Amino acid sequence: MQFQGSLVALVTPMQPDGSLDYDAYRSLIDWHVAEGTDGLVVVGTTGESPSVSMEEHAELIRVAVEHAAGRIPVIAGVGANSTDEAIHLARHAKAVGAQAGLSVVPYYNKPNQEGIYRHFRAVAEAVDLPTVLYNVPGRTVADMSNDTVLRLAEVPGIIGIKEATGDIARGALLLREAPAGFQVFSGDDPTAAALILLGARGNISVTANVAPRLMHELCTAARGGDVPRTRELNARLARLNKALFIEANPIPVKWALAQMGHTALGYRLPMVELSEQYHSLVRTALQEVGLL
């Protein structure tokens, strides 16, 4: 299974009381299809996976696959800090028809490199579902080394990685050393253009939640080696990329979507609304690219 381009790390819409808003979820999927987004990544970090129950997590995957209806590929967030839970989620994603699973480095329990390797190998061996690794040490604390990634790249069923460290030098080394066919994706909007120009297949993007067409165009230009166009689009999105991380993701991007009228403004504790001091900053960034 090959993926490329702009893959949106989709938010999970909620009502102000924290209940899941499946109507808005389906509407967002339709919008991304219309705007040219190349793939959906659901119930990951941006989708607030730690804040939903296992049953809700499974239903969000099922609804996304059902509503996408083959119009756009769906990568299901199947990560957990329990290997058994990760296997359970991956089996469900496979059963309902997701094209792949995104599996994050186990968080909080801080496994060493051998533990990380065995965790992902166990998931891949248990479920016949293409797996995209996800390294985001700023959220997980444990950091999967390039050496561990390269070991895992040899495991059947592990097809790629979302490289969300934001370290271009590290990503460049991984691109140079990874086996042919191993798919590297940026997971960091501010540095995505650079990594794609170096050979990454695309970007698993937070910014694409609010600027899907622009992010699709950026990824297309970078993949095609059009440096002037890539620089132009990257400069246009730079302020927005920064603003959407002014507080912990997905606080700013959910606030932005509510301002744009796509969703209600809802979170689940411990996530709360964007601090008022940042409202004008995010609003200005949206206005600058014509989204408000």
Swiss-Prot record:
Chief site of localization: cytoplasm
Annotated catalysed reactions: L-aspartate 4-semialdehyde + pyruvate = (2S,4S)-4-hydroxy-2,3,4,5-tetrahydrodipicolinate + H2O + H(+)
Key words, A-Z: Amino-acid biosynthesis, Cytoplasm, Diaminopimelate biosynthesis, Lyase, Lysine biosynthesis, Schiff base
EC numbers: 4.3.3.7
Pathway in which this enzyme or protein is active: Amino-acid biosynthesis; L-lysine biosynthesis via DAP pathway; (S)-tetrahydrodipicolinate from L-aspartate: step 3/4
Gene Ontology MF term list: 4-hydroxy-tetrahydrodipicolinate synthase activity
Binding-site positions, pyruvate: T46, I204
SMART domains: DHDPS
Pfam families assigned: DHDPS
Subcellular location(s) per record: Cytoplasm
GO cellular component: cytosol
Broad class of enzyme this protein falls into: lyase
Record GO biological process: diaminopimelate biosynthetic process; lysine biosynthetic process via diaminopimelate
Its biological purpose: Catalyzes the condensation of (S)-aspartate-beta-semialdehyde [(S)-ASA] and pyruvate to 4-hydroxy-tetrahydrodipicolinate (HTPA).
Family recorded in the similarity comment: Belongs to the DapA family.
NCBIfam families on file: dapA
Protein name in UniProt: 4-hydroxy-tetrahydrodipicolinate synthase
